[in-house]
Amino acid sequence: MTMTLTSLILALWAYAAPARETLTAARWWDLGHRIVARLADLRLTQHTRDAVRDILDGQSMADASVWADNIKNYRHDADALHYVNIPLRATAYVPSRQCPNGRCIIAAIERDRQVLADPKASRDDRAEALRFLIHFMGDLHQPLHDANNNDRGGNQRLVTFLGHDTNLHKVWDGELIDSSGVDQESYFAFLRGRMDSIDLPALERGTVVDWAMEGHRIAVEDAYGRIPRGGHIGRAYVAANRPVIDRQLIAAGVRLAKVLNEALAGYRPR
């Protein structure tokens, strides 16, 4: 089969970065995205799992989950699609203000879902939409991707975290979990076990907007609301918010599976 230029680019970038063995807080960290994808895979129907494997040409969802970050250096058209700037004091999502021209994560998820569900969409378009969707569903559940306090989602909110200088976004992108020294397999096993005690059908309820507003509330109450005076974040903040991160990763995986099961229900290999 002749590989198109788009297919070649997708393939090169899909496999360009090897899986990391330790956590890094550079973004909603790579292993966080991988864990979301692995949790989602547990909830896929066999039909959906086969469809995903076909669309990704055998690549795992975990490996596909980091593609959208790996292409940032040359795909600047997608930069604004990783987040939505809902003001911290807002009580509702207003698309005309917070997602002009559909340039936000909420609209991007819906577009990618539609491409996946479209039987007329090309294989390349479906592969790109799936890689974006896997990643964006992870980003949506990082609370600081859903809120803005005139500080670029916490990137300009300087804090000290367990004695070192950083910013609030990095804390929530991975440093909260990094501080425990956990490895991917142990953390995945822990979260998988936690799923047995959670009402997963309840997590599936709602819309993408509902889930973004849920993340916004967490940003208000937990991410910003628990910062000690002076911005010196210590163990008490970690202890209070580690369960929040755990729950968000589980929710992201469960909801990603729901979206994929629905979007690919009618998928037929070509």
Predicted segments, located by residue:
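Hydrophobic h-region of N-terminal signal peptides that target proteins for export
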Residues: 7-19
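Bacterial N-terminal signal peptides that target proteins for export
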Residues: 1-6
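N-terminal, motif-rich segments that launch catalysis or mediate targeting to/interaction with membranes
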Residues: 20-136, 143-270
